[in-house]
Amino acid sequence: MSSIARPPDPCLVAVVLIARSRAGPRFVFHYPPRPLADNALRPPKARRTSRSRSRQNSKGNDSTSSDDSHSSSDEDEEEAPSQNLNNSNNSNNNSYIAGSRRSSNFGLDDSNTLSENQRPGSISSSRAYLRKRGANSDAETDSGVGSDRQEDGSRESDGPNRVPWESILGLPVDVWEKLLSPSRSWHKRRFELGINDLAFVGWPVFVREDGNWRKQRRKKKKKQRAEWESGELGHNDATEDSQDDGNDAVAASTETLSPFSALHPISQRPSVPNSRSSQMSSEPLDADDKDMMTMFNVVFVLDPPLLEYSMRVREIYDNVIKKFSKALKWEQSRTNYVWRECQHILNIKEKAKEKRSSLNSLYADIISQSSLARAIRTLYTSISASKIASVTLSPDVSISLQIPPLTSTPYLPGPTDQAYPGLWLTTADSISPADDPMTDDNSAPHQVLAKHFALLLLDNEATIIKDVEAAGGALAPPLVHYIRCSSPTKSFVQISQISGMPLPTIQFLASHLVYWRRARAIPPLHQRDTYIVSPNCDLSKLEVASAAYKVAFPTLPSLPKMLSALSGTPRPYGNFIPSKDHKATYFLILAWLLRGGWVTQLRSFARVKVSPEIKMAVELAIRREEVDKYLSKGKPPVATSDKEDSVNDERTEGSDFDDASSSSSSSLASHGSGDATPMPNRFRADTGVDLTHSLLDQTASLKTSSLILLPHKVSPLESRWLDEIVARFPDNAPDFVGNTTEVDSATPIPAKSLKEVWPTYLKYFNGYDALEKIPVREGLKRKLVSQVLTRLGLVTGQSSTELDPREQVLVSFRHW
């Protein structure tokens, strides 16, 4: 599998709604009407055909059902009985007799006819398997496994007369009713079932034993907090999962269910008090109702590629399946919404069956009359197209769902990788690093943006503000204020200082805009930084982009001219700015180019080089220390007892064995235990000097240079190398004047000794952190940083001051 990051690919085939009442499970609705036919025009992908072939004669388990590691605890744990991980709704081993097809890309077909050379998928985790039938047999349920629901039997007996909506993916719906109706042990857990090349993933929700869909809690007075503080981002469920379904938690979850989206204004959003009052006014369901719903399960049918299976299933489960099911659960607890819609859909299907309506006519009626069916259709069409799905369940509940798109990639696609032209090419990570003091250890990953990044709006500022104001809500005023204050040239910290807004609030608002595809977090734009034409830019859109560029900047150089200039020898962006009066306009051009993926920042990286001279000096110093340590003991060099001689002989033999078999490394772990590290050519016992505890790495060559990979996690030997490097720095440094350009002043700046600034810079010489981070994170002048790096060996061009070879200790390279 290639290491290239890929954009969202939901691989969504269908969405299925299963409901179970006291009478038994019911297959309520699925979309699209013909999943295989509607997905037949999809681009071919590397599907899991190899696994299907390898399992053709195997009776192994084809399905997986795993517990959700983030299973919600917002209801009593005593709801679930003993954990019987059998995802069948019957305790006996049930056998389903069903058709099998291999003519489609998914390994399934809408045909109900069978052929003897085709195999069924095995479903052992549900205590079921699909058995072959003759070529003229119809797929129907085995007589030993009937539905819990007593019906007229028409669905089992009238195979040739079965209506088209009573079969999906080549199997009758009564088979799917049992397969997709797990036991109560799967309550609010990740339910996953594999059949052939398809994965069925859901988040089943069961009613409580008292007939309610949530735990009734007494009201608790809590400090009121702003509406947007309760998880409106829609992508942080960590706090919600750890809360009970009390009134306050429901109010908080309402805000998550109805996120303020700058993209899709949602009307009729309820306030928190309204949500609470409507929820408290709902009456508990009658436990004696013979037809009350006891479980519902929204199942997403996926067809992910084999090598990306886990990643694709996880992203759609975390971002769509779980959140949509939570929204339905909340609305079911308030108004019995899900069961009411299920009954309505089933009634429409019964009437259509009596009238012998066509499939298209039936679906037109269902979607026009059922808000839940419309929500499922919207969810399918939007998520399958990697768009944001804005779903309205009722006038009081709306929810926006999406799989967060990939905004950048650090890799260029290889010969066998699918190319995504126009994707931002960069290694810059906008997420707070682990050593950032502003990072919250308890926060979910990928939530906190690094405080030294800036915000680049992906649309016109006026357009975004207009959408935000139209949507309204408590989040609108701070969002509008932040959008007006933000600038791609100012970091979040700088915006906080200028606007007076708290830094965590700015990071939250910026994360909100990034999540809802309205902005992108980038390193702040600066005239001293270097920008080049992105190797991943989409030149097929050059003509269209040139027209848009001309409208935005009619009096400035055209887009082809700007790209041509940036394609030359890399140099600071300030060299392209004609004068100070053009500075703001040229930054707008740079932001426009970055927004479209036309350019990327060329960044510098470096590692510390250890020369053979440094290595030899350290080795001699260590040898000298060992000799001095031995002589300081004041013991006779040879006068030892027989017992001591025996011990020394054993130590010598063991050390010789280590010399031949071990290869010590310069990592911290290899020296942290205090074990002896043998050194070749050490003094023998007859001289009385034993240097077995030397720090020297016997595998390191003294004739070649070495690189220190992690300066902040060095081994003892590497630490001695660094100390020797610093010791050789000159104490006094002359005034230094760097490159002079139109935007750089040639005024000399008094340079400090490198011994003083070395600890500040050293941690960035790991080959991963761009050197452009140093002035931003350390609060230093960029020109001063450039001078220090030039003295240390960073190649930046001709210098007006002769460089000292003792200070040239860096090996630098540049990329995006």
Swiss-Prot record:
A Gene Ontology BP annotation from the UniProt entry: meiotic cell cycle
Keyword Signal assigned: yes
Keywords (A to Z) from UniProt: Meiosis, Signal
Residue stretches of biased makeup (Basic and acidic residues): 148-159, 225-238, 641-654
Ranges of Low complexity composition bias in the record: 82-95, 660-676
Compositional bias of kind Basic residues: 44-56, 214-224
Signal sequence coordinates: 1-23
One GO term describing the cellular component: GATOR1 complex
Region (Disordered): 26-166, 213-249, 262-287, 632-684
Biased composition (Polar residues): 101-127, 268-282
Family: Belongs to the NPR3 family.
Protein's job: Mediates inactivation of the TORC1 complex in response to amino acid starvation. Required for meiotic nuclear division.
Record-given protein name: Nitrogen permease regulator 3
Gene from which this protein is expressed: npr3
